[in-house]
Amino acid sequence: MKDAEKTVGKIADKAKICYLSYIDGKGFPVTRAMLRPREREGITTFYLSTNTSSNKVASLTANPNAGLYFVDTRFYRGVCLTGTVEILTDDESKKRIWRTGDTMYYKKGVTDPDYCVIKFTATGGRYYAGFKNEDFEI
């Protein structure tokens, strides 16, 4: 992969969904399909929305290590980023990624206590394309 920033960014931007993996309270791996990140800063930081009451928030609070996977089904390539998450509940973070129509998920609006932001910070990753894997650091 010649340019990780460009390649990974393109895959992430075109994906309609991504997959968030983490370890649950019983020590087992869990993978959840999520709507694609609302925002990203390069290929280091990604912001996703979720319900504060979800099992994933409890698990990620206890163990912030996680993976974020994006796939390009057209060219059969993908990237798994590894890193840590932080659960953000402050008004500024919530307003930052709020979108029209989010009341479908968060009935009380942007201040809904059951709405929070997952901030994923990548430290490395693995890119797959052409039957080959390539690890990279961020």
Task: Show where each model-derived region lies.
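Charged, amphipathic alpha-helical segments
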Residues: M1-K6, T50-K56, D102-M104
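Short Pro/Gly-enriched beta-strand edge/turn motifs at strand-loop
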Residues: K2, A15-Y19, R99-D102
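Localized chelating/binding microdomains
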Residues: A4-T7, Y19, F28, L81, ...
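A short, Trp-centered hydrophobic/proline-enriched beta-strand micro-motif
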Residues: K10-G25, A66-F70
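Short, surface-exposed beta-edge/turn micro-motifs
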Residues: A15-I17, T44-F46, N63-A66, P113-Y115, ...
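A short mixed-secondary-structure module that forms the rim of ligand-binding clefts
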Residues: P37-F75
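Charged, gly/pro-rich active-site loop segments
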Residues: C80-I138
